[in-house]
Structures are given as C-alpha cells and as structure tokens.
Regions:
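Extended, compositionally biased flexible segments
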Residues: 2-101
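A generic structural signal for short beta-strands and their flanking turns/coil linkers
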Residues: 27, 47-49, 56, 82-86, ...
Length: 233
C-alpha cells in the first residue's frame, strides 16, 4: 500500500472575504517593473515587455481584516523593502490566452505585499544571478482576504497606498500600471500553462523603501479593504 514518507504540509489556501470558502493556491507569479515611476526609481525607463518571477506558494502569509499580522524580519539582509501590489487570482487557465480569455480567467483580487531583500536582489543583479533568495524567503508575501470578481467587478482603476508607522510611503492608482492585469496574464500564458489557483502579483507603484523591526505596515486598495502587519525582530 502506497503511503507518504512523511506527512505533507497543508495545501496553501486564501480566505475568501465574507464567506467560509477557501481558495486553493497553485503557483504565485509576479510581474516586475509594471508602474513607470517605480521602474524609474529602480533605474529603468520605457515600456518594456512584462517580465516575470515567482514566489513559493508557502511564502504567502494570510492577513485577516481588522487584525494586525506579524512578519518576522528575515535573515541575511539589512535592507528589507515593501512593495504594495494588486494580486489577481485565476479561476481558470490555459496557454496562449487572448486578452478576452485572460480577462475571463480572473476569479478575484487581494491586496499583497511583495517583501524583498533588496540588498540580496541588487547583488544578484550585479552577478546576473536569479532573485530567488531576495524574493522567495519565508513569509515573503503577506496577503489580505480574497474578494471575488463577482463582488468587485473588474479592477482596472482605483487608488492604492501603503503607510509605514502612519506615514504615507507608496501611493498610486491601478490605471498607472504599464500593462493591465489581463495583458500580463495573456503574456504569462505564452510561457506557462496557467491553471485555476494561480496568483499574479501585478507590480508596485513608486515609493518602495526599507522596513525595520517594530514597523507597522498598512496597505490599502480601493474595494479590497486593508491589510496590516508588524515587522518583528
């Protein structure tokens, strides 16, 4: 009789807002430099084709509404950065999707924070190495409740902001994305067969910056509530 060598971890899932449902997470894709002003602050300009990287599904940390989560300051870094992002959850998938098909694949949305060990990322860039240790560490992706598209409609505009200790650090609008969520999904589907349960973090506006132990972080996107957490030593 076949049996596990050891008991596997529970499947990563997100809580669906205003319900008892759970959304099973398959993969977490991320879009780089998808807001022009953020691209500039990172030393780039122009409308380049979207590029992608990934985070492990088990790097997600579910943050419930009206509760402050706790994120441990990660090891091997002295420059941990916050990046506020709209997260898109897919309810269907496929390969080589048209823009219309990509739009129809969107199941819902959440607030996400792409935490980044910026010093390790910079060192990797200089050496032409992958970003995994900078982007895929434990607790690297705090994420809020998942709101079904049936409730929110398509999110293509609306303000988003991030505060650290009550001070506004990031502010923008979803209309400022260089590539829309659907355009990113369509492009991503030319590289991978997308499936239900995939998440896409769609990029961050300008104003990324360092976090220190003890900092309180609050992220908000219109229609998706708020996400808050504290950085623990």
């Amino acid at each position: 009789m076949t049996q596990w060598v050891f008991q596997p971890e529970p499947h990563t899932a997100l809580v669906v807002a205003q319900s008892e449902a759970l959304f099973p997470v398959r993969r977490v894709y991320c879009v780089g430099r998808n807001y022009a002003e953020h691209a500039k602050e990172m030393g780039h300009s122009g409308r380049e084709a979207p590029f992608f990287f990934t985070k492990p599904a088990n790097s997600l940390v579910q943050i419930l509404e009206n509760r402050e989560g706790i994120i441990q300051y990660p090891p091997r870094t002295k420059n941990l950065h916050h990046e506020l992002e709209l997260v898109v959850a897919l309810g269907s998938g496929g390969s080589n999707l048209s823009l219309e098909q990509a739009t129809e694949a969107i199941w819902g949305y959440a607030i996400g924070i792409d935490l980044t060990r910026r010093d390790l990322q910079s060192a990797a860039k200089e050496k032409g190495r992958p970003w995994d240790v900078a982007k895929g560490f434990d607790q690297a992706a705090p994420i809020g409740l998942l709101y079904p598209r049936s409730q929110t409609g398509l999110l293509e505009k609306g303000p988003l902001f991030l505060d650290v200790n009550g001070i506004r650090k990031q502010q923008g609008d979803l209309t400022q994305m260089i590539w829309s969520a659907a355009e990113c999904i369509a492009e991503l589907s030319t590289y991978f067969e997308l499936k239900a349960g995939d998440l896409l973090m769609t990029g961050t506006p300008a104003g990324v910056g360092a976090l220190e132990p003890g900092d309180h972080v609050l992220g908000s996107i219109e229609g998706l509530g708020q996400l808050s957490f504290r950085i623990d030593a």
